[in-house]
Amino acid sequence: MNENQFNEAMQQIVDALKKRGYNPYEQLTGYVKENNPTYITRHNGARDRIQTLDFERVKQFVNSMRG
């Protein structure tokens, strides 16, 4: 998966979290800290999608959200 595909997948996950009223940073941080997919909504397949992504890249993405 190239960088653009990864970023698109992460944006879809962030959008799904927002649509369900969650704070994406908090939910993704919980997912990374606990390695627990229940932090990610099932809405629009977000939970299934995040589990297909490289965990280290997800951690880097979450760290980049901090600013």
Report each predicted region and the residues it spans:
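Intrinsically disordered, low-complexity, basic-enriched segments
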Residues: 1-67
